[in-house]
């Protein structure tokens, strides 16, 4: 895996984190008008619709002889959709009982969960990467424990459980993304997630058209940018990035959530929160050095034919 390709993947993941950070503010605003299943069902549907033109154009422009693995595409997309539904639903329900900024911090706990799950899969991590995980976790503590103690409300706990869903999502992407077309896989995951959310909406919520219109701007932002654009960038970025490094970069969404909450909603950053943000940035740099060293030790792969 070449250094330029790795940096390109990390840049895509950083942009993803920025888009998601702003989405926490939009999600919090949307909950003032509609329920979590309605919100997620509509925004996931928008995400799938946004990607359809790109899929159709890529199909017409596909080079002759390019191979695809339909089975891996549908299995990976379906599993991603289920994991995304679980994570986003718990996060959306929990965000109604906590601040947008704090929800961003707690969601980023997948930075710890990804390498821990990797151990069960037999994936070894360097000491530098584990040090960056520890530093990022400590940074999350300073961000969450703004009152001097790590007090978990019901909303905080639901968002933390949602982080488990996002952990599974990252690991599933890591397994399937090298084998499939990233845009197609992203579209399938949104389709699966939206169907699950809309079924739950019909069972547990009674949305009104007027309320949906009032939540229009948050829905459009989260549907087009947070779903259609950002989740696709995540899949493309993870093609050339170690999953633990990817999780560390993506956890910067918590930092961006604080920044955008301050800029848009007027939430102020305390010195403690700024200190936590700084620790997380240092952890990201350490993780990137770790990823570069690990890839430098790997033998350069022999040239092969086109892969999907």
Language-model segments: which ranges?
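Helix-helix packing/entry segments at the starts of transmembrane helices
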Residues: 40-42, 103-109, 173-194, 227-263
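Hydrophobic alpha-helical transmembrane segments of multi-pass integral membrane proteins
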Residues: 7-12, 38-53, 74-75, 129-138, ...
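Specific transmembrane alpha-helical segments of multi-pass solute transporters/efflux pumps
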Residues: 19, 23-24, 52-107, 142, ...
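Hydrophobic transmembrane alpha-helices of multi-pass small-molecule transport proteins
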Residues: 51, 125-145, 166, 197, ...
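C-terminal-most transmembrane helix of multi-pass membrane proteins
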Residues: 2, 44, 52, 56, ...
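Hydrophobic/aromatic residues within transmembrane alpha-helices
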Residues: 30, 39, 43, 94, ...
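Hydrophobic/small/kink-forming positions within alpha-helical transmembrane segments
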Residues: 21, 25, 81, 85, ...
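Glycine-/small-residue-enriched transmembrane alpha-helix faces in small-molecule transporters
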Residues: 1-41, 82, 86, 90, ...
């Amino acid at each position: 895996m070449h250094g330029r390709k790795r940096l390109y993947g990390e840049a895509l993941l950083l942009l993803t984190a920025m888009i998601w950070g702003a989405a926490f503010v939009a999600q919090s605003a949307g909950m003032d008008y509609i329920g979590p299943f309605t919100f997620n069902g509509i925004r996931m549907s928008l995400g799938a619709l946004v990607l359809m033109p790109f899929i159709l154009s890529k199909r017409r422009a596909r080079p002759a002889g390019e191979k695809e693995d339909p089975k891996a595409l549908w299995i990976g997309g379906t599993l991603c959709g289920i994991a995304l539904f679980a994570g986003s639903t718990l996060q959306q329900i929990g965000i109604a009982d906590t601040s947008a900024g704090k929800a961003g911090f707690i969601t980023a706990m997948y930075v710890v969960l990804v390498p821990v799950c990797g151990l069960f899969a037999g994936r070894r991590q360097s000491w530098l990467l584990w040090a960056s995980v520890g530093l990022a976790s400590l940074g999350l503590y300073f961000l969450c424990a703004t009152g001097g103690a790590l007090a978990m409300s019901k909303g905080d706990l639901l968002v933390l459980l949602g982080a488990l869903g996002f952990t599974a999502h990252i690991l599933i992407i890591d397994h399937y993304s090298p084998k499939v077309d990233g845009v197609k896989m992203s579209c399938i995951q949104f389709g699966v997630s939206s169907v699950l959310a809309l079924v739950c909406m019909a069972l547990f919520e009674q949305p009104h058209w007027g309320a949906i219109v009032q939540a229009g701007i948050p829905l459009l932002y989260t549907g087009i940018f947070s779903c259609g654009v950002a989740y696709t960038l995540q899949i493309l970025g993870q093609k050339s990035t170690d999953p633990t490094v990817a999780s560390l970069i993506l956890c910067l969404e918590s930092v961006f959530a604080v920044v955008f909450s301050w800029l848009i909603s007027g939430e102020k950053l305390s010195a403690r929160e700024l200190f936590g943000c700084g620790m997380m940035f240092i952890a990201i740099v350490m993780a990137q050095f770790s990823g570069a060293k690990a890839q430098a030790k790997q033998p350069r792969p022999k040239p092969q034919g086109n892969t999907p």
